[in-house]
Amino acid sequence: MSTEPAPLLALDLTGTFAFGLNGALTAVRAARLDVVGVVVLGMITALGGGVIRDVLIDSLPPAAFLDWRYYTLAAAGGLLAFAVSRHLRRLEPAITVLDAVGLSTFAVIGASKALDAGLAVVPAMLLGVITAVGGGTIRDTLVGRIPTVLRTGLYAIPALAGAAVTVATTETGVYGLPAALGAAAVCFLIRMLGLHFGINAPEPPETRPSGGGTRRQK
């Protein structure tokens, strides 16, 4: 069983279910899969980032394999996604919110666990981001999509912000659920505001064809 403090464990399990449901719904949207494929991809989304984190901080076996609640909630999210997949178009807003919830909670938990393992500030922030985006990256790769974290839109940046707030509050001696929720809220708000206003991370300038190529219409 997990040895996390109860408030952080509750946050971690919430993110696990949210990412399991979101990951499975995203998989249904991207590829035609049977129930096994949907559940497996939901579990990969929910557990993949945490497994990568635990391997990197040498916390083995990973927490996802030691506590039945993690894989049970991830699988439950996948099964629920399969059950409601016929209403996928109407669920688009829910998919977006669930993704932001999972991203936020995992960024906070990942950074917190990295600090507990003795990592310095910058590595802890990076592990927070890896925890948040790792599972979704594996899922997207398996269904043949460019991973969400590599496409336009704010994704890794909100996770980094949430991890940074977690590190800052911990380093100043502020712990517990209020601090974790505050850090998660920062990540969630940046992600949702970025989507609402269409804010993207900086992109390289477009390359223009040499010679007499036609100009793109704006």
UniProtKB/Swiss-Prot annotation:
InterPro entries per the UniProt record, alphabetical: Gly_transporter (IPR005115)
UniProt KW Transmembrane keyword: yes
Predominant place of localization: membrane
Membrane protein topology class: Multi-pass membrane protein
Origin superkingdom: Bacteria
Organism: Streptomyces coelicolor (strain ATCC BAA-471 / A3(2) / M145)
PANTHER family per the UniProt record, alphabetical: INNER MEMBRANE PROTEIN, UPF0126 INNER MEMBRANE PROTEIN YADS-RELATED
UniProtKB keywords: Cell membrane, Membrane, Transmembrane, Transmembrane helix
Protein name: UPF0126 membrane protein SCO4104
Subcellular location: Cell membrane
Family recorded in the similarity comment: Belongs to the UPF0126 family.
GO cellular component: plasma membrane
Transmembrane segments annotated in the record for this chain: 8-28, 37-57, 64-84, 91-111, 118-138, 154-174, 179-199
